[in-house]
């Protein structure tokens, strides 16, 4: 402990400690309430944003039946590049009438990942 007690930094006239950020007990409790209110306000904003995103996903996906057969997929569904859901019997693009061109996309990816490397020709003597 230090020799001389310090007063509250908010000027209320009560004594404070360094453990309570140089605030008296009343001011420190008020400070904690304000901090928790700020935290809850940011938490509520984040949850509202997350709820909006899930609501948008729900409207896009509907009843989780992303194909023409209207079968409910549940947790077994996968998202296709076109945005539809498909499962084991629809795992081929032709089965769920996917407009995405997988072959040309795969060829482009392979061309970028594996560039053609040619060395200089050596002249024979």
Swiss-Prot record:
UniProt entry keywords in alphabetical sequence: Metal-binding, Zinc, Zinc-finger
Domain of life: Eukaryota
SUPFAM superfamilies noted in UniProt: AN1-like Zinc finger, Glucocorticoid receptor-like (DNA-binding domain)
InterPro entries from the UniProt entry: AN1-like_Znf, AN1_A20_ZnFinger, Znf_A20, Znf_AN1
Ligase is among the record's keywords: no
An annotated Gene Ontology molecular function: zinc ion binding
Protein name per UniProt: Putative zinc finger A20 and AN1 domain-containing stress-associated protein 8
Pfam short name (any one): zf-A20
Cited PANTHER family: AN1-TYPE ZINC FINGER PROTEIN, ZINC FINGER A20 AND AN1 DOMAIN-CONTAINING STRESS-ASSOCIATED PROTEIN 8-RELATED
Function statement: May be involved in environmental stress response.
Zinc finger (A20-type): 2-36
UniProt: Zn(2+) 2 binding residues: 80, 82, 96, 98
Positions that bind Zn(2+) 1: 8, 12, 24, 27
Start and end residues, zinc fingers (AN1-type): 61-106
Annotated TM spans: none
């Amino acid at each position: 402990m230090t020799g001389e007690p310090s007063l509250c930094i908010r000027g209320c006239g009560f004594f404070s400690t360094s453990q309570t950020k140089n605030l008296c007990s009343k001011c420190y409790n008020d400070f904690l309430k304000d901090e928790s209110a700020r935290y809850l306000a940011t938490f509520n904003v984040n949850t509202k944003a997350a709820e909006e995103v899930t609501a948008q996903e729900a409207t896009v996906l509907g009843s989780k039946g992303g194909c023409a057969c209207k079968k409910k997929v549940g947790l077994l569904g996968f998202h296709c590049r076109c945005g539809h859901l498909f499962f084991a019997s629809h795992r081929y693009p032709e089965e769920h009438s996917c407009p995405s061109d997988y072959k040309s996309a795969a060829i482009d990816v392979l061309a970028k990942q594996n560039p053609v490397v040619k060395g200089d020709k050596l002249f024979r003597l």
